[in-house]
């Protein structure tokens, strides 16, 4: 009796035994059609055997259409993911095969790659970068100031791999960033890359997967999930904006796509290129320890000047009530508009106001399901929780003390800034971009097109606008609240603030005119601002690494979080304490249990246990051994977060 263990793309499932018929020849990695729970699914041949402990064994129906298969390298990646991130094989297989490709034959469109590409002439600095990248056998970071032409450099590397007939993956933190890159790609290479993100339809996914498996798809531009596409001939992985937190998935399987891409590159023997003007501290550490190679671009493309950085001391500004733009910034915007230039106002806070409260009794409007304030959205006339999506009406009186006319709103969101800008600049064309105002890639592309065509004078946006966009006529950036996030107790608060300010400032002055960036702050002496002002990221990285080393925190150590959640706070805390009490003795430091920064989410109370260990310590083996001593009750959900990026 011939048996195959079939890995199905079903969450929390391990490989299952199926019988191989006499006329069927199979190899490990082949895709086959099997029945599972009254459904016909496509699975991966995981192992071949002659014995099975199962009493009733179903038979493999057939090979998948076109005799498609998964490479041994992708199988190795699945195994590594399961081991490193302590996740079930079936959950990871679902990332590789997110759709049943055996359903209905579908036409596969082949990308027509020509060997003649229209690539712009590079500067001497860029040519040297391309040479280093071609010769490097390590993951290589292109670290360049904003507007230095990092994209054009990796386009030259892509051209080499396309000529060799290899497949290429370009990873972006958000596909919203992709529209400008896609257009530039088409201009340079003469064909359209395949796009892979959450908005791709089921039918499109099926077509793309078959195209990749049959080597008819050559170039994919996608978000973090594109990393798991089953390429057969992958030669190059580009990780653009490698520092971005969007590469970390914080639900289902908790994994870092940037780090996993590095591992995939090793399995596939693919070149890895990372890009960022503000690299992550982990990447800087890997360069200093010679695991990665560094390519530096000190100058903007065509030697365009970097913007001036001006810090506005808001303690000295006398603002009218409910106003948030300083006189200095207002005057600068007026001058900018007179010169027919565009401006960007940045505030990383959605909605109209982050808090509504009662002046009589102090009642704050918080989410009934989360430990978070309800955000006022004036356009929809709703209070909304940005964590679970719960909405409520805007009250006319306090629901706690029942007093009338005592409710007030505190602080600005971008809708409030837009309202102020419209009053100050009534003749200007003003647009707002955030997850609320641009919910689809198409809407984002429309706003970007309007900016490029000078149909917008002032763009007001959240973090979504900081990610690598190029607007030649944008010469002024105003950061409304530069303090936001920097006083956070999070490990990476300083790093994120520096990256965010540097990135948003980098949108200014990328054309022929010099740019200027205004940072409004109530703490102008914050050392982060001095690093941003002089553009001294190297000194910032050195200082931050010294702080991390003194605290024995990543990248100088390994960390993992155990996140426990459930509807009864006392029961969850009790389980968390028991877990800590039974921890085996080892060379690790255990902190907690403590309430998560987001102590209640979607109705569930949340506690964290943080484990810190030496870099060489096998943390996964220790956690598996430790958690084997306790049975987690059904009322408690536990997640293991290896290399956590946040502690919310």
From Swiss-Prot:
Binding-site residues, Zn(2+) 1: 358, 361, 398, 401
Record's catalysed reaction(s): Couples ATP hydrolysis with the unwinding of duplex DNA by translocating in the 3'-5' direction; ATP + H2O = ADP + phosphate + H(+)
InterPro entries attached to this UniProt entry: DEAD/DEAH_box_helicase_dom (IPR011545), Helicase_ATP-bd (IPR014001), Helicase_C-like (IPR001650), P-loop_NTPase (IPR027417), PriA (IPR005259), PriA_3primeBD (IPR041222), PriA_3primeBD_sf (IPR042115), PriA_C (IPR041236)
Enzyme class (EC, first level): isomerase
Domain of life of the organism encoding this protein: Bacteria
UniProt-listed Enzyme Commission number(s): 5.6.2.4
Keywords assigned by UniProt, alphabetized: ATP-binding, DNA replication, DNA-binding, Helicase, Hydrolase, Isomerase, Metal-binding, Nucleotide-binding, Primosome, Zinc
Subunit description: Component of the replication restart primosome.
Protein name: Replication restart protein PriA
Organism annotation: Rickettsia prowazekii (strain Madrid E)
Biological classification of the source: Bacteria, Pseudomonadati, Pseudomonadota, Alphaproteobacteria, Rickettsiales
